[in-house]
Amino acid sequence: MLKDNPLIFLTVTFLTAWSASYNAMSQTERTQPQLSAIIDSLEEQDQKWRHLWTLVHNHQSTGSLTEGEILLNLRQTDSLNFFTLKKIIGEIGYPAIAEVGSTSSKNFWLLVQHQDRHPEFQGRVLKLMKVAVDAGQAYAEDYAYLLDRVLINTGQLQVYGTQMVLDSTKTSFKPKPVSDMVNLNARRKYVGLPSIEIYIQEMNERYHEFLTSDK
């Protein structure tokens, strides 16, 4: 199953890596610690099953859990999280850094990134997140990832080149179709992302097992 769905694995592992770096950050002071705890608990379950999915791909032990059981739990977790995320958005809008802290704010973004089965919801969150970014209450680089995700999921050109795919030779990753490729690096720099060349290099190093030269 995993060999037939390499892009699913790439999405899982790439976002897992982002989550790990985010959780290393110190949580800023927050006015809604209970909401922060809820978001973090959702993220914990999210990452639990994505970590196990990564172990399966790397042919490492997952105890008594089978690949099918892990994938089922991963999908069920995403489905259950959707209802909680939707409730949070409906009640307070996008969780601001001042409300839930920097880590929980990023965790919320990460959870929304995983809601590809609900592109309309992702689009709704995107609009609210833009307001938060403009107010300094969410991170521009996170917004860039979600914007690209929404655009690609709705058949449009991405803006920041964050969504990747293997090239035709399967020797390197490349960004999925981007609008105004000439000014891509300027846009990436503006929101705090590295150049597309560095990003491609990082992807190739991180997911080298998917490249033809490593098989």
Task: Please state what every model-predicted region is.
Residues 28-154:
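N-terminal helix-rich structural modules
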Residues 5, 77, 121, 179-180:
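Generic detector of ordered secondary-structure context
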Residues 1-31:
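Bacterial Sec-dependent N-terminal signal peptides
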Residues 202-206:
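Low-complexity, Gly/Ser/Thr/Pro-rich intrinsically disordered linker/tail segments
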